[in-house]
């Protein structure tokens, strides 16, 4: 099973948009992607999730991020389900869904629990534009995902990469420091001195030398 920091395994998959090679299909376009699995088509919780992902698709695309679903179903099942969602709920699913009918990719990614039958759990893999796995989340089959948290996670990772900072709990609505971001702790005596000086000048704020934070530039 892959872990955070590893490259996403190279694999060609069947989808509702045709064959796709992962992660190259997105990496070559310079895009991040969120791969998420669902237990089965034509199930209530999964339907609410797909509608929710589609409603937030523009938010993901503004973050240069694509969506791709997966379940252990055949492609015709995906196509019929997507058709049903459009006809009954007036929501058109625009992103591809992987038809992992043999469960090979799901098995490789650790999406199948031996205690939950042959269907996937609700896994989420966030992969950056270099094809590196940046985050992995697992939800049980009986609980739908918090989709706003997945948007927040992608945004936080991208800001962290760009600015070299860390994000506090519930960023940008942290209980202690609000929408400010955390400066990585000093790793030398000289850095501690520099942090204290920067704090005295009002350039940053510190609760102590190891807990400093600032507004985003």
UniProtKB/Swiss-Prot annotation:
Substrate binds at residue 122. The active site is a conserved redox-active cysteine residue, the peroxidatic cysteine (C(P)), which makes the nucleophilic attack on the peroxide substrate. The peroxide oxidizes the C(P)-SH to cysteine sulfenic acid (C(P)-SOH), which then reacts with another cysteine residue, the resolving cysteine (C(R)), to form a disulfide bridge. The disulfide is subsequently reduced by an appropriate electron donor to complete the catalytic cycle. Residues 2-159 form the Thioredoxin domain. GO terms for cellular component: cytosol. Signal peptide: none annotated. GO terms for biological process: cell redox homeostasis. The lineage of its organism: Archaea, Methanobacteriati, Methanobacteriota, Methanomada group, Methanococci. InterPro entries: AhpC/TSA (IPR000866), Peroxiredoxin (IPR050217), Peroxiredoxin_AhpC-typ (IPR024706), Peroxiredoxin_C (IPR019479), Peroxiredoxin_TDXH (IPR022915), PRX_1cys (IPR045020), Thioredoxin-like_sf (IPR036249), Thioredoxin_domain (IPR013766). Disulfide bonds join 206-212. Thiol-specific peroxidase that catalyzes the reduction of hydrogen peroxide and organic hydroperoxides to water and alcohols, respectively. Plays a role in cell protection against oxidative stress by detoxifying peroxides. Its main location: cytoplasm. It comes from the Archaea. SUPFAM superfamilies: Thioredoxin-like. This is Peroxiredoxin. Keywords: Antioxidant, Cytoplasm, Disulfide bond, Oxidoreductase, Peroxidase, Redox-active center. Belongs to the peroxiredoxin family. Prx6 subfamily. It catalyses: a hydroperoxide + [thioredoxin]-dithiol = an alcohol + [thioredoxin]-disulfide + H2O.
